[in-house]
Amino acid sequence: MIQLQRVSKQYDKGTIALRDINLFIDKGEFVYLIGPSGSGKSTLMKLLYREEMQNRGTIRVGDFNLNKLKERQVPHLRRTVGVVFQDFKLLPKLNVYENIAYALEVTGESGRTIKARVKEVLELVGLAHKAKSYPNQLSGGEQQRVAIARAIANRPAILIADEPTGNLDPETAMGIHRVLESIHRRGTTILMGTHNDTLVDHFQHRVVVLEGGRIVRDDRKGDYHESH
């Protein structure tokens, strides 16, 4: 599902973000990507949806070989990969329904499909009653639920979540993670970057640890928690 072979990333000013990364994530896995700030977590995730490109190595995401991906194919890749950010990135002048519908409109879905999909994902994240609310009328946790709903509206096979609970209080963070668990149970592969040890310890999925741009640990389900 996701495969990185000897992947390295260096920025123009000489900063090395990733060094010789080898990582395989199977279909249906839930994987935590953890490590200190500057360890390369966000860079690795950006490579997977072609926000950035590696300098060396091979990346495969689903059916896409990113080394051979043409610019016109990037939108097709991004329908396969949903992305959730720490800062929500909702459009302030659109209500909840419209924020999610917009993600479907740009891919050319029909009005009937859009209506059904928005209803489906709002029910999944527990916000069907907030469809007509605007972002400034929502709590931080509610805004993140909308962002998650938008990310899965196209039914992506993979969901990348970069610090999705970073700005939230512990109780709200736990609620957001339970939403991600529900999505995972539907068969979606999830890669989640986080600093939240409480969530990692509680839910016990596979843990990949980055330090200095290198993978220093890759613990299968339960192993990290037994040795942590």
What are these regions (language model features)?
Residues 49:
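Helix-to-loop junction immediately C-terminal to a conserved catalytic motif
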Residues 134-138, 142:
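Conserved ABC ATPase signature
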Residues 153-157:
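A short, proline-enriched helix->beta-strand linker immediately N-terminal to the Walker B motif
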